[in-house]
Amino acid sequence: MNSLRILIVDDSPAMRAYVRRTVQLASLPVKNVFEAGNGVEALEIVRKENREPNKLDLIFADLNMPVMNGEEFVQKLREDERDANVPVLIISTDATQKRVTRLRELGAQGYISKPCQPEMIRLKVQQLLGEEPSLSRREL
């Protein structure tokens, strides 16, 4: 796995710090971590940072944020073909099956319920980026 460029989108600074720390402690080769407090800020970062030769490798996004929520963010992100292939992992407390299905239809690749364990984040990242998880490959 190459050095990763990751974007964390959450209105909670504490949650952004938690995800950042978890990714770093998971022994993943992180090169850059960008942070945004809502979907509008995230799109600005994506439009600036997700360009050749330094594309983003993964986006973590919350659902319930001010200005632009996570669902709107994923939808807007997928409208630009240059950003259509960046994996998006949703981390949120809003875990209804209907909502998860809608997010997958919009283009999110995974979902983790808050509060989330560091091991769950690591396993999901490995799955999304094509690494063989060290635990079972059950659907998370």
Spans of model-derived segments:
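A Lys-centered signature of the CheY-like receiver
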Residues: 11, 114
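Acidic, metal-coordinating helix/loop segments flanking the phosphotransfer/catalytic sites
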Residues: 35-58
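Active-site residues of response regulator receiver
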Residues: 62, 92
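Receiver (REC) domain active-site loop signature in two-component systems and cognate sites
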Residues: 65
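Two-component/phosphorelay signaling modules centered on CheY-like receiver
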Residues: 13-34
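C-terminal output helix
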Residues: 116-125
